[in-house]
Amino acid sequence: MAFKLSTKHLADIGAQTEKSIRIPSYDRNDVKEGIVHVGVGGFHRAHLAVYVDKLMQSHGVRDYAICGVGLQPADASMRDVLASQDHMYTVIERSAAGSTAHVVGSIRNFLFAPDDREAVIAKMAHPDTHIVSLTITESGYYYNENTHELQSEHPDIQHDLDPANAAKPKTTFGFLYAAMVRRREQGLKPFTVLSCDNMLKNGSITRNMLQSFAKLKDPSMADWIAQYGGFPNAMVDRITPRTSDPDIKELADKFKIDDAWPVVTEPFMQWVVEDKFADGRPPFDLVGVQVVKDVKDVEQFEKHKLRLLNASHSAMGYPGQLAGFKYVHEVMEHPLYRKFIWQMMQEEVKPLLPEIPGVDIDAYCNTLMERFSNPTIMDQLPRIALNSSGKMPQFVMPSIAEAIWVTGPFRRLVFVAACWFRYVLGVDDKGNKFEVDDPMREELQSKAQAGGTKPHEILSIKSLFGDDLRGDERFLKEVTQAMEDIARDGVMATMPKFVNDA
């Protein structure tokens, strides 16, 4: 019989010594909620929440328990599951050596904004709150990749700028601003805003977007945030696929834990964070976090990760779905596709990356290939493909733009872009339809349909693409040819043209 995950059954779960299940040994009632986290999904629960749990478990940290926040109606599911389990959940780590289970207790509460927006603002403004961390995906920042400015005309931002809506914000920035106003009125320091999203210069972008928002509301608040605020840049890494029913069943059968929403992940985890906190921080360095003083160090790690790991994910997600693959490890098991990924990293991306003292890029690439090949975590292509309009401009297009600038090789990267332009139509090479999960889906599909096998229509979206792409003849020729070949022959029949020794 599986034990329902709860405080009541925690000792029973931990007593299964033959399973070596780690459970919280600290008193979860004897903590303060010093971190408010917006966007509690799989990645947060496998990353920041695990680091905090380790600090509480092994180093006696008690002032940085987490209060989760859900801003969207869809977050009601997470609220309900966590509440039913006393806000605990299980992390399942999978590798070739087998699976381990770890009950995480660092999340102590969860606030659902659609039910009570005031409670969220009050929690962020509370003196005990030192950090508000974010995993809100790229689209949640309302950041124009082309102009590097806030999308101030977006209806959600316009809603939050309206003084009549000051007490009922919709966006993360609306909540952050409202809470910052209260802290200033109370004579408190601003909390640190800690982005944990996959974006180059994520802290700087967060700072600039919040300050831009504040300037439109009250310029004096923008000045206060600029003077006293903390927005660390950070590089985060841990592959975390969507939880499936078989995952839940395995946890119940193998570990005797009845958990409605566990997290499945890999053993590897990494976090490099700039030491730029406004109101104190936990001793993250005690649990393996690389805390660095120089923002350039973070940016270099981040650039390596986004351009190699995340770009490779894109190179598997968009061509892979068109070709009918379902999982990352399936792509890596295909000899031709595996060569394509390796050659893209080595010949097109690696030459554009800065050297980091003590980091062997070839070894890093080999580690990525091993991680991608892990069949036990069953990482789904739809997961790594979602929100493509936020990912491709971050992960792939910058390498293409830099290759244009230095007249470097970019054919494989362009092939990935061509596949993305086909992917947004939601039809694979065999005519099977699939869902395109993207906040810009309608615009992307409209442009892709209008353009056919030509890229000009989709490249006209100025929030995603700059003139450096639209005006480069070499890029336009390569991407047009790739789009025509893919439309006529399919992804896998076209790919050999982009692989040496295919």
From Swiss-Prot:
Lineage summary: Eukaryota, Fungi, Dikarya, Ascomycota, Pezizomycotina
Protein name: Mannitol 2-dehydrogenase
Subunit composition and interactions: Monomer.
Reactions catalysed: D-mannitol + NAD(+) = D-fructose + NADH + H(+)
Classification via Pfam families: Mannitol_dh, Mannitol_dh_C
Known function: Catalyzes the NAD(H)-dependent interconversion of D-fructose and D-mannitol in the mannitol metabolic pathway.
Organism from which the protein derives: Pyricularia oryzae (strain 70-15 / ATCC MYA-4617 / FGSC 8958) (Rice blast fungus)
Gene Ontology molecular-function annotations: mannitol 2-dehydrogenase activity; mannitol dehydrogenase activity
InterPro entries in alphabetical order: 6-PGluconate_DH-like_C_sf, 6PGD_dom2, Mannitol_DH, Mannitol_DH/Oxidoreductase, Mannitol_DH_C, Mannitol_DH_N, NAD(P)-bd_dom_sf
